[in-house]
């Protein structure tokens, strides 16, 4: 069932201990009392039967959250309607699937206040990274859309963090550039100390506002690089 496949194993073990303390057990996706399966229709009822507030999957970690749930003290999570914008976005100018214009329309439909446009930098040739000229052309499109009103389009770029910690920024882009998403896209096998210093050097750049995919891990596909977070 979902509850047995979602969240950490530690959380599930803590949930089972809580059930056992009440003479119950969780097995085969059901809540049992002796040999009888209790009438529990969903997760909300399962947690309620154990005297707890429902714990969203995002909070299922080391088991300590169950204590908070028992006292109705879980934090309120951010919901889609709370979002006002996003900054790490690509368009068809690099390797995205929507144009700048389509991104602006989508942001308006979502009720966002802003949307950052941060296509890849030149070093990301595999992702059609933008040269200085192409970035300038994109910014002219952004200026035109911003002049019409609606969610503000923010001028950014996802800059590769080079092995020495420098950011791969198109020449002259500092004038007009509002923010940088700094990301590691190469040299994943550096030693932890060197990788950490590399990333620290990048985030110290005055234009850097976002550290993109900070661990480099691709779930079930690639382990993260070594660094001290």
Language model region names:
Residues 31-32, 37-38, 172-176, 188-189, ...:
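Hydrophobic/basic alpha-helical segments enriched in Actinobacteria
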Residues 163-173, 199-200, 222-227:
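Distinct, well-ordered alpha-helical segments
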Residues 108-109, 169-177, 201-207:
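Acidic (Asp/Glu)-rich catalytic clusters
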Residues 136-139, 166-181:
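Short, electropositive alpha-helical surface patch
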Residues 65-162, 187-189, 193, 210, ...:
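An N-terminally biased module of ancient metal coordination in phosphate/nucleic-acid-related enzymes
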Residues 3, 127-129, 165-168:
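Short acidic, glycine/serine/threonine-rich loops at helix termini
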Residues 1-79:
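Acidic, metal-coordinating catalytic segment for phosphate/diphosphate chemistry
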């Amino acid at each position: 069932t979902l509850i047995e496949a979602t969240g950490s194993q530690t959380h599930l073990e803590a949930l089972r201990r809580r059930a056992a303390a009440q003479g119950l057990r969780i097995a085969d996706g059901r809540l049992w009392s002796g040999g009888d399966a209790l009438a529990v229709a969903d997760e909300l009822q399962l947690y309620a039967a154990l005297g707890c507030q429902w714990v969203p999957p995002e909070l299922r970690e080391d088991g300590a959250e169950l204590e908070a749930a028992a006292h109705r003290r879980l934090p309120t999570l951010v919901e889609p309607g709370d979002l006002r914008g996003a900054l790490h976005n690509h368009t068809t100018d690099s390797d995205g699937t929507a144009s700048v214009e389509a991104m602006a329309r989508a942001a308006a439909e979502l009720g966002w206040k802003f949307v950052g446009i941060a296509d890849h930098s030149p070093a990301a040739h595999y992702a059609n990274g933008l040269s200085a000229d192409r970035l300038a052309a994109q910014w002219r499109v952004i200026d035109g859309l911003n002049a019409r009103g609606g969610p503000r389009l923010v001028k950014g770029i996802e800059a590769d963090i080079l092995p020495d910690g420098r950011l791969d920024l198109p020449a002259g882009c500092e004038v007009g550039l509002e923010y940088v998403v700094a990301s590691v896209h190469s040299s994943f096998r550096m030693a932890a100390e060197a990788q950490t210093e590399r990333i620290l050097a990048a985030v110290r750049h005055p234009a850097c506002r976002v550290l993109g995919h900070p661990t480099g891990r691709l779930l079930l596909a690639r382990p993260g690089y070594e660094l001290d977070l």
